[in-house]
């Protein structure tokens, strides 16, 4: 089972679609196939830059694309639900047991409320997920009814992921429209998501 095959897997795509619909009905930002694909590619970029083997890069792409399928069941504990769903799907493939467990573990650990990085693959997935900040993720069209997460995403007009291998630093450069969200407000919301600062230690 490869990343390319997972991207075409009917079960995976159906779970992503339903999860995104559920979150849309609850007022959350976009969690569609676009988000899943971006997280997969960004997580792979992180591991590639740090010199991890192709096998790990392939596994993190699969985990990245599948990481939010648990939203089809419930937003609460979606990481754990997603891990169970992923295990069931991947059991039907030719993926070795050890690789399947690695993917399932990363998916189950990716949410800040219950998880945390335990290895390079889970760390790269968490970081990649948190760096998907973009205007196109906002579904609400009426700016007057934006919640804080809508404002943070809508305020971003451009993003660039920077990876400094020598200093072992990963940073996200953001271009922000101050008419939508002040710099203070932006960083105040980011401060609340303190979990984002923890996973880098999982990348040795």
Regions found by a protein language model. Name each.
Residues 60, 64, 81, 107, ...:
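Short alpha-helical catalytic segment bearing the HExxH-like zincin motif
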Residues 38, 81, 123:
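Charged catalytic carboxylate motif
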Residues 135-204:
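Terminal helices and disordered tails flanking the catalytic cores of nucleotide-processing hydrolases
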Residues 96-158:
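Histidine/acidic-rich helix-loop-helix segments that form or flank divalent-metal centers
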Residues 42, 84-85, 192-196:
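Long, highly charged amphipathic alpha-helices
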Residues 8, 17-23, 48, 52, ...:
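Extended, compositionally biased eukaryotic interaction scaffolds
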